């Protein structure tokens, strides 16, 4: 089911920023030849899926670019996991969209403060 969301999501990114991303690195649930071809048709240079399906191969300018994109995505996943576990974002019991947004916003701010203070303490 995720495979059908790839094209509309890429289009929304292009519409929002007015620019085609040079690189994409995506979850294996989006991996399909159709999505790879769609990204290429939009002008994306490097397309990396976390998990390869069948004969599909990642389209990258170099092996080092593929490695960098995979590591970047792993770092993002680690941040998301940290936020979910450390700031109880597994489930939001706050009622309403505005309250949900407030919970996420303040959790992200708290996470960033924790990361920054950790970096400052490490320098001491």
Language model: regions and residue ranges:
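Active-site beta-loop-alpha junctions of metal-dependent nucleic acid enzymes
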Residues: 1-17
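Residue-identity detector for glycine
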Residues: 7, 18, 28-29, 43, ...
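Short glycine-/small-residue-rich flexible loop motifs, especially phosphate/cofactor-binding loops
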Residues: 11, 36, 81
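Basic, amphipathic alpha-helical segments enriched in Lys/Arg and hydrophobic/aromatic residues
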Residues: 66-124
């Amino acid at each position: 089911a995720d495979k059908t969301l790839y094209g509309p999501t890429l289009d929304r990114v292009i519409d929002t920023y007015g620019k085609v991303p040079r690189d994409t690195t995506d979850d294996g649930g989006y991996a399909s030849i159709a999505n790879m071809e769609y990204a290429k048709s939009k002008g994306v240079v490097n397309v990396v899926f976390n998990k390869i399906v069948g004969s599909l191969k990642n389209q990258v300018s170099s092996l080092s670019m593929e490695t960098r994109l995979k590591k970047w995505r792993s770092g993002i996943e680690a941040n998301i996991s940290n936020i979910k576990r450390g700031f109880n974002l597994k489930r939001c019991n706050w009622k309403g969209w505005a309250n949900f947004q407030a919970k996420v916003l303040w959790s992200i701010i708290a996470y960033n403060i924790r990361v920054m203070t950790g970096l400052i303490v490490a320098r001491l």
